[in-house]
């Protein structure tokens, strides 16, 4: 089985990705990013994205309650279902799940990072 990560940036060619997936004969799971969709929804709703940089140089997005709502709308809603639709149009029988569904993915909360001001 293959696990394939597809980025969530605005430059991702999903039509090309799905065409490549249609040629795969082995079972696969796609992990789909949606950061561009999240940023677009944030702009539409007037929510300003806050980026943080740790002292080690790692960048991340601060996620307050409104940002979490936008993340869920983008990842499990728009991007997920549009990708499933595109797969179905290309004869790939697909289902879109998130890590929240049936606790498919569980992680440990980061205890915090030291942020550069």
Predicted ranges, named:
Residues 1-117:
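Nucleotide/pyrophosphate-binding catalytic subdomain
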